[in-house]
Amino acid sequence: VLQAARGRRQKDDDDDKKKKNGLRLIIHTREGHRADLTDLHSIKHQRPGAPSATKVIGTEGPRGRILIRGEPGHDIIPELYPQRGEPIIDKPGKGSFYATDLDAILKSQGIETLLVCGVTTEVCVHTTIREANDRGYYCIMLEDCCGSFFDDFHDTAVRMITAQGGIFGSVSDSTKLLAALDKSS
């Protein structure tokens, strides 16, 4: 899906008429904190309800300190790594708008609709969609491009987005997106 979106965005960039309504910007986000943890709230760090064996942010993991910017485990995997012109938003919270310049980036581009995908559905994806909705963006979650450790959490998060006629947005999938992109080209 990412490769198809990149191809379509390039095609739209070359056609001024389609540029306005096409896929204009691919933004990557990742949750991470400063090495000194000054941007980490104590309640998030301590997780009082977690079992004592739970690794917490900043502790050593198999790929460096967990959720610390600059550590190998914090980087985006090669298959999804941003290309030139695709910004990376480093976020200290679960949502992509909290303590970031995402809203300013989207507004500067005149973007009003967001296609949202990622992990985990019930935490980062869901929080981002709620934050976006509060700021007036229309969100479409690509369900098959999202994931969770728990299928029932994923399913519940999807139902919550579309409840009450789409209280936070709508849900689609990559097949429908790719078909729509093909149809409009």
Predicted regions and their residues:
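A short, N-terminal amphipathic alpha-helix
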Residues: 1-25
